[in-house]
Amino acid sequence: MTEITAAMVKELREKSGAGMMDCKKALAETNGDMEAAIDWLRAKGIAKADKKSGRTAAEGLIGVATMGHKAVVVELNSETDFVARNDAFQDLIRGIAQVALTTDGTVDAVSAATYPATGKSVADSIKDAIATIGENMTLRRSAALEVPHGVVATYVHNAAGDGIGKLGVLVALKSEGDKAVLNSIGRQVAMHIAATNPLAIRAEEVDAAVAERERNVFIEQARESGKPEAIIEKMVDGRMRKFFEEVALLSQAFVINPDITVGAAIKEVEKEAGASIEVTGMVRLLLGEGVEKEESDFAAEVAAVAKG
């Protein structure tokens, strides 16, 4: 039996928003398994889906760049927001995004590519910037999307300047249609992705493990009702259909016009575009996603200083 520590209870409480005693019981019931404990709380109706687990803490900026039928998004982290507002830092991430356009978009490829302003690799150029600015920096994530015909639309939220901000989105639309129409609907869909963070483009593309986890939670919730298994199965199937509608891009209610789905909104502009439109890819990077920032205990710091 795993020992349930105060730190574990605190972590579960922060992730689930549930009470301390509920968290302690959940951990005891699941032998200290954090993810299973979250599911246990959800099944009991004590906690909602774990939306706090990907806590955003790191500073820095997200940068996007476009060239022809290709676009990239990169994340450059810094220790403080003050440095992220520095012109040199902003120029650096814009430059890195431009370099990323010449690669396959992976962090390794971008890091190894030559940064024109210095003639060195991007990785070494970041090291030089660290020495100059005096703060650690990390090229944490990078991604690229490309279509042979169509557009890759971009959107930056909380923009700190041209092409840089706290959240960046790419969405690839494959089409032979009018570019102006494609860019317009593409930007709207990118804004939608920024707002809703869909798990996949289509329901059938949702990760099987994620879907299975949801189904198991729904089964436990339904069993709490005490209804027969046949009824429970129908209840779960209904909840799963709703789950897929809510997490798959094309079946989500369009934030710009909630009366229709994203898929329907795209279909509506096909006539104006003069060709069919297919969403072939999407990327959404939120600054610091999944990175825990060290939080100092002010009271403990004062106590430590007082003790000399």
UniProtKB/Swiss-Prot annotation:
CDD domains in alphabetical order: UBA_EF-Ts
One Pfam family matching this protein: EF_TS
Chief location of this protein within or outside the cell: cytoplasm
Gene name in the database record: tsf
Source organism: Agrobacterium fabrum (strain C58 / ATCC 33970)
Protein name: Elongation factor Ts
UniProt GO molecular function: translation elongation factor activity
Domain of life of the native organism: Bacteria
Its job: Associates with the EF-Tu.GDP complex and induces the exchange of GDP to GTP. It remains bound to the aminoacyl-tRNA.EF-Tu.GTP complex up to the GTP hydrolysis stage on the ribosome.
